[in-house]
A protein has these predicted regions:
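Eukaryotic N-terminal accessory cofactor-binding modules
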Residues: 44-45
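Conserved hydrophobic/aromatic packing and binding residues within compact polymer-binding modules
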Residues: 24-25, 129
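A short gly/proline-enriched turn/hairpin at secondary-structure junctions
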Residues: 35-40
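Non-catalytic cell-wall polysaccharide-engagement segments
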Residues: 2-19, 31-32, 48-69, 73, ...
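A mature extracytoplasmic/lumenal domain signature
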Residues: 25, 74-79
């Protein structure tokens, strides 16, 4: 699935940068088209392996009033109505990615009204995608988990610049100069057109 993901994403969710969408999908469903996640109650003992099996399970969960997420982007069942999804279409990879793009783009456009910095707005949008709130996704660790899927490492801790007595430790005179640090967060920078991210 991962080998096909870039092509599907470019066709079905072109307004979300592939790096962002890939990190999101890896965390949400591990790129499993038929993934079903139970939010409350006992989790599925095994995941469905066919579209028919996934549809049958989803219909049973809805019948029982179970709160669950489905498909590549783990779209919550409570959002299916306004996204035009059902127990069959939610497991179509293209339709599911379109829905994920719709949710994320909506969150991002609203986050931009609160955050002038586009990367901060992006993180707030990820929080919104998970919780419907710009802050709870930070508190529950979701945002950091998605960032980790993007391969972004936490930078080394630095001593406070306010303490003038602190001096950098000299390891060796022959030590090569370190490379400049990359920007925090995503290494790609979005532009405001439709939640698209571009490389520096």
């Amino acid at each position: 699935m991962l080998a096909e993901f870039a092509l599907i994403a470019a066709t079905c969710a072109p307004n979300v940068h592939i790096d962002t969408l890939s990190a999101l999908i890896k965390h949400e469903s591990a790129a499993n088209v038929f993934a079903i996640g139970i939010n409350k109650g006992k989790r599925l003992s095994t995941q469905p392996v066919t579209a028919d099996e996934a549809t049958d399970i989803a219909e049973e969960l809805i019948k029982n009033g179970t709160d669950f997420d489905a498909g590549l982007g783990q779209i919550n069942v409570r959002n299916w109505s306004w996204l035009g999804l059902n127990t069959t279409t939610v497991f179509d990879p293209c339709i599911n990615l379109k829905a994920a793009q719709t949710v994320l783009s909506d969150c991002y456009s609203r986050a931009l009204k609160q955050h002038q910095d586009q990367q901060k707005a992006l993180r707030a949008a990820l929080s919104c995608y998970n919780t419907g709130n710009f802050e709870r996704g930070f508190k529950n660790g979701y945002v950091n988990k998605v960032i980790a899927q993007a391969g972004i490492k936490i930078p080394a801790i630095r001593a406070s610049s306010g303490n003038k007595k602190e001096q950098p430790v000299q390891v060796s005179k022959t030590t090569k100069k370190s490379k400049p640090k990359s920007n925090d967060g995503f290494s790609i920078k979005p532009i405001t057109d439709g939640f698209r991210l571009t490389d520096h």
